[in-house]
């Protein structure tokens, strides 16, 4: 079976031409595999093991994903014959088309499929992810995770895959080493005349690795890598950064024991929740997190523009809910102010993380308490209690709810004017909280 691939504005990557294939069609696309479990969200990211070390609430519901698109070699005329052109499945790059490394990723996937490789289920994890192997034995190009049918394609029903793409789009210049990721829509004809089925998937470059962070001690990791992953997690309010979704990048064989190891973050399906929640930062108590940011890291944080990032997400991922985008803006502002005030990554993460009281009940984090005060100042809470959020907070709630003495704040209930007033009030409250944290850390 062949598959048609959407153009990158008629740009053909040179490396694909060199392999005598181009991005117009591919062979050996396994429809049964792509059709399987479209509505489920899985956690096997980057082909890594299914290690989580966490309760079911903490398990990642998504994974970095890879899509198969390619074009076999042919004669001088690469176009399909007229009688088959109407029956070819089509692949469209829905989001991330122009982002760093996406065109190259699609080209490599195309070349791999053209060379005769097939999709195979990934080993380990919660299942559902598909590996695209390269032309050399044991080499993986990408992981594919189908995520929806026609309904999901139209409405982006699976929000986890949107967050995977969002994390990549927000990793400017590859600062945190998020691998190239794009959103793909695959349309395939079925037996009924003039009928097609549509599958949505995300595609992400496979990360070559031998270990995840849970299999090595943190002393082996470079300070820069820990800081960069942490900066990304703070911006995204990642509630699922456990050791199993931090991969340890393979160093050159000649220097395996001579230099700190770099990290690659995967599995971002539980970042950017739609209401404030308790993040999980595996790196929080690593020694690197207590070291000051470098000048380059401070410059990067200072350069972040939360309002421009918000516009990027609205343009590329219009189905991502506005409360999630506002979480990004808020967390980025918090990160910028905290870093400028001289706080280290561990201090920033600690302010965002809830503590357990003597009665083993979660209390508000410092960050949440600031947000609650600012929210209540511009939008007084309702006297009627709302049911508590279900699970991880992703895709939950557009209002402030109360239960058991604790509030879960979302910003979907704020008008544009109220949101602007909230940010203004938040920034008024923030300096005193940052000063208090600095005094506590130095005492």
Positions of the model-derived regions?
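ATP-dependent kinase catalytic cores of phosphoinositide-metabolizing enzymes
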Residues: 1-239, 243-443
